Amino acid sequence: MDGYRPGLLDRLLGGPPGARFLSQEQVKDSLARDLEVLLNTRTALPQYLLQGYPECAASILNFGLADFAGLSQSGSEDRARICSSVRQAVERHEPRLRNVEVSLAETPGTVNRIDIVISGMLWPHGANEAVSFSAALQPSSLHYSIKRGGIA
């Protein structure tokens, strides 16, 4: 095989003309873009409404994250809740990433910014490579930016 087949979103959006396969680096770039979309989407329903409906909880209906506006990065319970929510969303909606781990990183010199590190194993078509992505939430815009590797 000459590469990896593009994901559904890439095929629907009509990626580069004539590109039937992606390199491993292109897969990582695609994964970073899709993680950014996931983190910048807010769920429509609160989690407690979906507890009795596991199929709905794992569906596109539950795509995205809950709003963290009322949580504090300095509180250990809130930090754990943010990490758990991000990990669950990634595990639920990103099949190319396995063994997902999420942690909050503290970046010296930043105020009111949440930095999240998402790591796991890249898993398209049998590839097995450790990857990490950094997400930075800018409170003024409430927008996450994602980059591969270090702090965004």
Predicted regions and their residues:
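A short, glycine/Asx- and small/polar-enriched loop/turn
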Residues: 59-61, 110-115
